From Swiss-Prot:
Pathway(s) served: Amino-acid biosynthesis; L-arginine biosynthesis; L-arginine from L-ornithine and carbamoyl phosphate: step 3/3
Superkingdom field: Bacteria
Signal peptide interval: none
The protein, known as: Argininosuccinate lyase
Entry-linked SUPFAM superfamilies: L-aspartase-like
Record gene name: argH
Pfam families in UniProt: ASL_C2 (PF14698), Lyase_1 (PF00206)
Protein keywords: Amino-acid biosynthesis, Arginine biosynthesis, Cytoplasm, Lyase
Length: 464
């Protein structure tokens, strides 16, 4: 049976064309065509290897490679006719290659299946995407370090349960996000190592009878290692799941950061101002300046969580080896990578432009008895057990609530009614500056420690 009657490369087994709706339903070219560059890269390496082992002659190799490069140019110029009836990016490129160079184009697929071809393409694509994302994480971290250095002495309230807890510096707070992003960076670097293993040569599932040189192809494509089992090579999507897991954690961090930015820009907090270019207005309320960028990042986080759940669900019931189910791996993976990359880019642009409102931050830190723990620590240094100190300060705070006075606003006589161990020097520890400066250890909020942490952060980024 001629393949012309079915319009498919695999049509020899079939006696009628695929139903038109089924062709549209099963086609993936609308979304997997973004793999074209990596598909061509893999094909060039495959053709090079086939010539090296004698399956192709040098002229055939060169003709194929020239044809593939021409096709890449057509695609990038917008002159390529993507055909749904050819199913996917692989068959579209192969069909166009055969149109251009004739029967030699049909030799390219020797020793290869679309199963190992697509697995290779996705890994090549993801490897590049991770590199871009790592660059955006670094750019965001650079912005955080710059802000933290500027704001090393800016005091704001630290919160637990969204209630005022203790004074911290704004620089210290920003560096918490730097630490989270460092872990995200490490996870993605680790994920990239496992994505960077080459399945090409696994063929459909059992390998191939041709004398292929997988080590050569591996070297040409820059993979770190060859997949060690052909069944696993074509069916493994762990790397995609692992990426989506790492992306989900990174997006969770950005979502938490977004929530703080939304709160801080509100009229109730007014801690920071976002430049107009990162905000939008209201169609009905003229006064509104909405923090749409952090809100949207917070909302998009659910998409990435969904991609992870979708891929886990996709894979959980599949027997070895390749199944058509795996066509559904690309859209969630693509979307997760796009969403994380764009969210990081938005934050990397926005964070250096944040303008903190120093006076409002400081005034907020003065509310809520934020130096209560410092008073308890003062009494401990006077020889009292911490639990007794905790209770003493609790009584003092209750008195402050009843009288409308912060601890630092009380007179010495007022404070001494709770403990005769309190002396005039107590007021040095009840100031905001005294509180933050007292926490002068690695990881603490003291300005000196913030500057030291910034220096360590700069060294870390320089080492990448």
């Amino acid at each position: 049976m001629s393949t012309d009657k079915t319009n498919q490369s695999w049509g020899g087994r079939f006696s009628e064309p695929v139903d038109a709706f089924v062709a549209r339903f099963t086609a993936s070219v609308d979304f997997d065509k973004r793999l074209y560059r990596h598909d061509i890269m893999g094909s060039i390496a495959h053709a090079t290897m086939l010539a090296q082992v004698g399956v192709l002659n040098d002229k055939e190799r060169d003709t194929i490679i020239d044809g593939l490069k021409t096709i890449q140019g057509e695609i990038e110029a917008g002159n390529f006719d993507w055909r749904v009836d050819l199913e996917d990016v692989h068959m579209n490129i192969e069909a166009r290659l055969t149109d251009r160079i004739g029967i030699t184009g049909k030799k390219l697929h020797t020793g290869r299946s679309r199963n190992d071809q697509v697995a290779t393409d996705i890994r090549l694509w993801l490897r590049d995407e991770i590199d871009i994302i790592l660059g955006e994480i670094t750019r965001l971290q650079q912005g955080l370090l710059e802000q933290a250095e500027r704001e090393a002495e800016t005091i704001m309230p630290g919160f637990t349960h969204l209630q005022t807890a203790q004074p911290v510096t704004f620089g210290h707070h920003l560096l918490a996000w730097f630490e989270m992003l460092s872990r995200d960076y490490e996870r993605l670097v680790d994920c990239r190592k496992r994505a960077n293993r080459m399945p090409l040569g696994s063929a459909a599932l059992a390998g191939t009878t041709y004398p292929i040189d997988r080590e050569l192809t591996c070297k040409l494509l820059g993979f770190e290692a060859v997949a060690g089992n052909s069944l696993d090579g074509v069916s493994d999507r762990d790397f995609a799941i692992e990426f989506c897991a790492a992306a989900s954690i990174a997006m969770m961090h950005l979502s938490r950061f977004s929530e703080e930015l939304v709160l801080w820009t509100s009229a109730q907090f007014q801690f920071i101002d976002l430049p107009d270019r990162f905000c939008t207005g209201s169609s009905i309320m003229p006064q509104k300046k909405n923090p749409d960028v952090p809100e949207l990042v917070r909302g998009k986080t659910g998409r990435v969580f969904g991609a992870l759940t979708g891929l886990l669900t996709l894979m959980k019931g599949q027997p070895l080896a390749y199944n058509k189910d795996n066509q559904e791996d690309k859209e969630p993976l693509f979307d997760a990578a796009d969403t994380l990359r764009d969210s990081l880019r938005a934050f990397a642009d926005m964070i250096p432009a944040i303008k903190p409102k120093h006076a409002i931050m400081r005034e907020a830190a003065l509310r809520g008895f934020s130096t209560a723990t410092d008073l308890a620590d003062y009494l401990v240094r006077r020889g009292l057990p911490f639990r007794d100190c905790h209770e003493i300060v609790g009584h003092a705070v209750k008195y402050g609530v009843d009288t409308g006075k912060d601890l630092a606003e009380m007179s010495l006589d007022e404070l001494r009614q709770f403990s005769d161990q309190i002396e005039q020097d107590v007021f040095a520890v009840l100031t905001l500056e005294g509180s933050v400066n007292a926490r002068n250890h690695i990881g603490g909020t003291a300005p000196a420690q913030v500057r030291a942490a910034v220096a360590r952060g700069k060294a870390l980024l320089a080492s990448r």
